[in-house]
């Protein structure tokens, strides 16, 4: 496997790409008849991305995590998803004609680290609202929310996914 967790090497600056380390390995593998699986670099974001989008770092019940460790970005963040698609498409353009490439790996260690960013909150409330066809009374009933004054009277009152309500 090659090319995974090398995003900062492949895109050292936003929109500046360098896949020379990938092509160097692929050329050697072609010569030696070694099969290669291409891994996506997306489970470790480059520093420029964290700087440009501070809210791309995962937000969990303790708050926003700092940049540094791998896999602590919010995989639901719009910018993360945009840049993932872009780097993967660029990488595929580079590797597509090498006969030694026999497959692709789309992250083997995807994690979410309990992400509870605002976009996760909104997506969850939209999903639950759809499941209940907007029937907030049925939702309150099914979850017993009248007890301990947990009842919600509008979907905007839905409690944060960062914690739980008493229950």
Predicted regions and their residues:
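Aromatic-lined substrate-binding rim segments of carbohydrate-active enzymes
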Residues: 1-65, 92
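Polysaccharide-binding and catalytic clefts of secreted carbohydrate-active enzymes
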Residues: 66-167
């Amino acid at each position: 496997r090659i090319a995974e967790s090398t995003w900062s090497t492949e895109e050292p600056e936003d929109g500046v790409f360098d896949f020379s380390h990938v092509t160097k390995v692929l050329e050697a593998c072609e010569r030696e008849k070694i099969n290669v699986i291409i891994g996506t670099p997306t489970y470790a974001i480059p520093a420029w991305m964290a700087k440009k989008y501070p809210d791309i770092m995962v937000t969990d019940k303790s708050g926003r995590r700092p940049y540094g460790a791998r896999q602590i970005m919010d995989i639901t963040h719009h910018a993360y998803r945009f840049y993932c698609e872009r780097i993967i498409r660029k990488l595929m353009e580079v590797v597509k004609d090498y006969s030694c490439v026999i497959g692709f790996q789309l992250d083997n260690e995807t994690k979410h680290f309990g992400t509870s960013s605002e976009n996760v909150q909104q997506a969850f409330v939209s999903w639950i609202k759809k499941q209940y066809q907007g029937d907030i009374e049925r939702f309150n009933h099914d979850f017993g929310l009248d007890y301990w004054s947990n009842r919600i009277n509008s979907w905007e009152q839905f409690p944060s996914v960062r914690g739980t309500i008493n229950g």
